[in-house]
Every structure is written in structure tokens, then in C-alpha cells.
Amino acid sequence: MSTDLGTAEEMETRELVHFVTQQTRFALINNILQHPEQLPSMYELEELNPSVSDATVYKHIQKLIDAGIVKEVALDDDQRRQGYPWKFYGLTDEGRAFLEEHNLLAAEETLQQIYDTISDKPEKMVKYENAPRPGDV
């Protein structure tokens, strides 16, 4: 069915573009893209968004998971280490493809370069950044 607004599929696509480009969600997607492993922990996402409450970061990550853009990945029980994160957040293959298709990954390399220049990361963030990730072992 086609309307003045386009087909139902086009409308869904526009809604999803609008959804992922909402300020907080798009910032979180960019945080994932700029992370060295593209798998930050919740703590890292919270630290990278100091003007947003931890609860809001969590809520928007959950919305991105529900939409199929982001996935939660966890270390196996035998790989977990006390004092280190074991849950991480990354783009799904479908999420990456959608962002690529709509030219929302254009700044990926620049984001990674900017992240590399952050020199005043809290010690805990550096520790978490270097924590083992699924697939490392």
C-alpha cells in the first residue's frame, strides 16, 4: 500500500532512522563504534555520557537491543574475572547493515581516532576497556 508518505516499508524505515538518530541513542551507537573493540561495557557507556543518568543510558541501550540494532554479549562463566565486566554491547550485523545503508557509519574511523586521543579516562575505565571480551580467549 502506498500513501503520500510512501509505502509501509518506507515509513518503517524512516521511523527506524528517526529512532536510531534520537540524540541519546545515536550517542550510544557512536560510543560503540568508537570503542577499540566495538564492545563497551555498560560502565564505559555511562562514563562516556556524563550528562545522561545511568538509568537513561541503560534504558536506551535496551531500546536499541529491542530494535535489533544492538546486542548484548557476555563472557562465558569460565572466562569471567572478579572485578571486571562480563557483559558488553555491540552492533548486530543487521544493525550495522542498516546504519551503513543509511550512511550513518560515515564517521566511524574519525570516532575511533577521537576516542584514542582521550587522555583523562578514569583508571576504572581503562581497566574495563582492556578487559577480556567474548572471542578474545
PLM regions: where:
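A short, conserved structural fragment
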Residues: I65-D77
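Short acidic, hydrophobic short linear motifs in intrinsically disordered regions
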Residues: Q38-L48
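Amphipathic alpha-helical dimerization/coiled-coil segments
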Residues: D93-V137
